[in-house]
Swiss-Prot record:
Intervals, Extracellular compartment: 239-241
Protein name per its UniProtKB record: HTH-type transcriptional activator ArnR1
Molecular function per GO: DNA binding
Keyword annotations from UniProtKB, A to Z: Activator, Cell membrane, DNA-binding, Membrane, Transcription, Transcription regulation, Transmembrane, Transmembrane helix
Organism: Sulfolobus acidocaldarius (strain ATCC 33909 / DSM 639 / JCM 8929 / NBRC 15157 / NCIMB 11770)
Induction record: Not induced under starvation conditions.
Segments of the chain annotated as binding DNA: 42-65
Length: 269
């Protein structure tokens, strides 16, 4: 790996260790707002990104703990010196190629990290494709909470940069649909980012996502909680009528939360 590429990946590791892109988008939104607008109140931040003030306060508390944000006065917060350096580190890798290829093909295979949002979605999409082998725009956009058009833009960008490749898959009904899978180039990137490397080894998470039909841990966890909230009262009401199904149902109620717990533990190892 060239010295420039090594520097890029070192910076990416540093960024990922300070604020986990794949799990803390709200924190990055706050950092971006403070970087562009300057010191702001929690109410202003809440209105800007259309998120509850309580969520903003919780996220800011975590950023303060990480020494990325500091209280200016009262309810107003601004970037700390460490926070400013974090964004400067990101700026330093904008438009830098992150490919090992030294020949003329380097231009078409390079990743231009034009903004933090692009980096966030790059990691999220790589993460989903890594855990689920393949992704579709419809399902991925729903789980990320963004429009299909927005996600399509990012996916097409990453496809052009050789991070994803499109495959036409035929359904049982004979209809063709586009799915996206990782390329060899993106697998190299995955192997160099700690967060994605941990996910690759996270078997409980892969099983949980498969059982719940989800791309992301947060969505799977929501489905598990909803399933248990509905199932437990129903099971108690019908317990004398289900027979062997009662034992199976109870097993699933216990299994899913356990998988959720182990998935989180494995992600921290």
């Amino acid at each position: 790996m060239s010295s420039m590429n090594k520097r890029v990946f070192d910076i990416l590791r540093e960024l990922d260790s300070l604020v986990d892109f794949s799990r803390a988008k709200l924190q990055w939104d706050i950092l971006i707002i403070l970087a562009t607008k300057g010191p702001s109140s929690t109410t202003e931040i809440s209105q800007t990104i259309n998120t509850s003030r309580k969520s903003i306060i919780d996220a800011i508390r975590k950023l303060v703990d990480k020494e990325l944000v500091t209280k200016v006065k009262g309810d107003i917060y601004g970037l700390s010196e460490k926070g400013e350096k974090l964004l400067e580190s990101f700026d330093s890798i904008m438009s830098i190629n992150v490919t090992d290829k030294p020949d003329s093909s380097i231009e078409s295979n390079s990743i231009s990290l034009t903004n933090i949002a692009e980096y966030f979605y790059m990691l999220e999409i790589l993460k989903m494709a890594l855990l689920n082998k393949q992704i579709t725009i419809d399902k991925a956009s729903h789980e990320l909470g963004i429009s299909k058009q927005t996600l399509k833009y990012y996916i097409e960008t990453f496809t052009e940069n050789k991070l994803l490749k499109v495959v036409n898959q035929e359904s049982v009904l004979g209809k063709s649909k586009k799915i996206y899978v990782l390329t060899d180039e993106s697998r190299k990137l995955v192997s160099r980012l700690p967060e994605l490397t941990r996910l690759k080894r996270n078997l409980p998470l892969k099983i949980l996502l498969k059982l719940t039909g989800s791309y992301r841990y947060e969505i799977a966890l929501t489905k598990v909680m909803l399933f248990n909230v509905i199932s437990i009262p129903v099971l108690m009401y019908l317990k004398d009528q289900l027979g062997i199904l009662e034992a199976i149902w109870l097993y699933v109620i216990i299994l899913l939360p356990l998988l959720s717990i182990f998935a989180e533990i494995f992600n921290r190892i």
